[in-house]
Swiss-Prot record:
Keywords from the UniProt entry: Cleavage on pair of basic residues, Disulfide bond, Secreted, Signal, Toxin
Tissues expressing this chain: Expressed by the venom duct.
Domain-related comment: The cysteine framework is V (CC-CC).
Protein name as it appears in the record: Conotoxin Tx-D0111
Organism expressing this protein natively: Conus textile (Cloth-of-gold cone)
Superkingdom as given in the UniProt entry: Eukaryota
Subcellular location(s) per record: Secreted
Propeptide positions: 20-47
GO MF term (any one): toxin activity
One GO cellular component, as annotated: extracellular region
Record's keyword annotation contains Secreted: yes
Length: 63
């Protein structure tokens, strides 16, 4: 029974220590634009261009 208070105190000390597994986020760590958003933007840009022939650049019309 004498070990029980020591065990409880150790558990409380372990629980109160800061965790190193989760890094703090800073402004520099924020994720950039997602790949999905970039792909969607590229597809929208390509869908706005209408070309009659791929080798005739003068025929291309950007709407």
């Amino acid at each position: 029974m004498r070990c029980l208070p020591v065990f409880v105190i150790l558990l409380l000390l372990i629980a109160s220590t800061p965790s190193d597994t989760v890094p703090l986020k800073t402004k520099d760590d924020m994720p950039q634009a997602s790949f999905h958003g970039n792909a969607r933007r590229t597809l929208q840009m390509l869908s706005k261009k209408q070309c009659c022939w791929y080798f005739d650049i003068s025929c291309c019309i950007t709407v």
